[in-house]
């Protein structure tokens, strides 16, 4: 019982320190989505084969919504496969607010976002320009659909249809993610204290070369909680930076789930899911090799 109370109090203090940063981050996100959502959608839909650039930049906005929008646009053939993949690979949803709430990790956050954006644009251009002719026409996407025929908006109103203040939506997101962070941190702390930090670190460390591959697989879970899980594991020292990048590159939030629901071709959906995993695993392993070579 004493062990539980010690871990509980330590977890409560650590997570409570994040609240102000989390709330400010979500307040900014809600403002951007509410005031500029339609412009952002128009920018994404109008990119053509160059759509990987706005796709990667918009994917950085920390919420699951833009990956869902991209999935709807791709299913309606408004955007290309390269643009879709750029959005998926750049999406970080809850990981950004979580790292923003930890000033000690701001340098890692900047590095993470630079890597993800550059890599997302690279993959997008590779698919839309270099490999375009090698892909089936039905898989390429783009050009045949119209953005105004696709409804991608998230409701920000109460049960009676009245507009909801953005601070309320931001507070709701903050509390939701706070509860998850607290619960995960508590369970993680109890496991580490019970098993021992050395044993736990040894298990993850023994994955060696395959840790980014496994992290990329975890990132495919169509839930924003997956990115929180991997970020917390990284902060706790149980996950390498290369594995964090791999997991967050495949962590497209609800984007893949929406794709499976709205795109009628299961073969295309399976290919895109596998491609997302392969791209995430590749960049993670690549970073791991570079770090090992430099060291």
Model feature map: region roles:
Residues 1-31, 38, 111-212, 273-295:
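Selected transmembrane alpha-helices and immediately adjacent juxtamembrane segments
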Residues 36, 260-279:
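Interfacial loop-to-transmembrane junctions
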Residues 39-66:
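Active-site-flanking structural segment that lines cofactor/substrate pockets
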Residues 45-46, 83-88, 270-275:
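Cytoplasmic-side transmembrane-helix entry/capping segments in multi-pass membrane proteins
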Residues 58-113, 192-263:
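Membrane-interfacial helix-loop connectors
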């Amino acid at each position: 019982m004493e062990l539980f109370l010690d871990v509980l109090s330590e977890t409560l203090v650590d997570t409570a320190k994040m609240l102000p940063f989390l709330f400010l981050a979500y307040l900014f996100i809600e403002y951007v989505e509410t005031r500029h959502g339609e412009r952002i959608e128009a920018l994404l839909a109008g990119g053509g084969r160059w759509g990987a650039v706005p796709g990667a930049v918009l994917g950085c906005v920390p919420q699951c919504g833009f990956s869902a929008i991209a999935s709807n646009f791709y299913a309606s053939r408004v955007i290309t496969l390269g643009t879709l993949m750029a959005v998926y690979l750049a999406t970080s949803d809850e990981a950004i607010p979580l790292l923003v709430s930890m000033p000690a990790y701001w340098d890692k956050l900047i590095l993470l976002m630079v890597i993800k954006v550059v890599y997302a644009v690279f993959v997008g251009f590779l698919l839309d320009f270099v490999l375009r002719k090698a892909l089936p026409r039905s898989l390429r996407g783009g050009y045949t659909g119209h953005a105004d025929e696709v409804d991608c908006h998230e409701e920000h109103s109460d049960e009676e249809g009245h507009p909801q203040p953005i601070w309320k939506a931001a507070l709701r997101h903050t509390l939701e993610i706070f509860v998850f962070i607290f619960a995960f941190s508590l369970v993680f702390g109890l496991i580490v204290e019970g098993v021992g930090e050395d044993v736990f670190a040894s298990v993850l460390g023994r994955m060696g070369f395959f840790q980014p591959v496994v992290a990329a697989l975890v990132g495919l879970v169509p839930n924003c909680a997956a990115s929180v899980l991997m970020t917390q594991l990284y902060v706790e020292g149980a996950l390498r930076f290369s594995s964090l990048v791999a997991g967050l590159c495949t962590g497209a939030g609800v984007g893949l789930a929406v794709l499976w629901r709205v795109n009628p071709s299961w073969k295309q959906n399976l290919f895109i899911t596998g491609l997302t995993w392969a791209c995430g695993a590749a960049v993670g392993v690549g970073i791991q090799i570079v770090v090992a070579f430099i060291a």
